[in-house]
């Protein structure tokens, strides 16, 4: 069973690629035709590849590991933030800081600083400092939150990345590849699919196309996590039933008179 309907993809404009003169020849296998100077993506191939990608994401999500959502372009950032939060996953929707993956220990220090400022507001520290100092701390926290808020709870590098627009997120791609982290991505006709482990040929500029794909990824993760919880509950119930069942004592032999 497919995660998508062809009609939904058509309505969302998933099939519209870039101008033919801006294409990447490596995307030729995923292009159906050229129309009015624009490449049209072969949605039959998108259906198959999207299903493969979502099946792989489902398997990762069931292990309990995290999948980072990445999309900082204007059309994607709000969608990325909303869907990643719904799925309980880390995300980057503002600027990608160099070293977010390859120098994660340093990034964690900035996250701890942000959390420390939060504690100051609740433990009474704010009452002991000047108004100017409170203002400076507030600005510092706001800046950290804008950039790092989406990964504030992340304690280790993610198991995979899902990316919208691999040309724009080239630093994230480079870092993930250097660490061997699987990359799932919407790949438009002007991109190099060889940089991605799981290619989803799709329009990465139209809001409706982005929404359709990102929502499907989030839905897959939510369902996989729910299944994992259900399986864990059933396993505990089976374990409890097994421990409560007491073996019957064998009948004592009658003594001979």
Curated annotation (Swiss-Prot):
User: Which PROSITE patterns does its entry note?
Assistant: RIBOSOMAL_S2_1 (PS00962), RIBOSOMAL_S2_2 (PS00963)
* Location of the region described as Disordered in the Swiss-Prot/TrEMBL record: 237-257
What keyword terms does UniProt attach to this protein? Ribonucleoprotein, Ribosomal protein
Is Glycosyltransferase given among the entry's keywords?
no
SUPFAM superfamilies, per the entry: Ribosomal protein S2 (SSF52313)
Q: Which GO molecular function entries does the Swiss-Prot or TrEMBL record give?
A: structural constituent of ribosome
UniProt record similarity statement: Belongs to the universal ribosomal protein uS2 family.
What's the protein called, per UniProt? Small ribosomal subunit protein uS2
Source species: Chlorobium phaeovibrioides (strain DSM 265 / 1930) (Prosthecochloris vibrioformis (strain DSM 265))
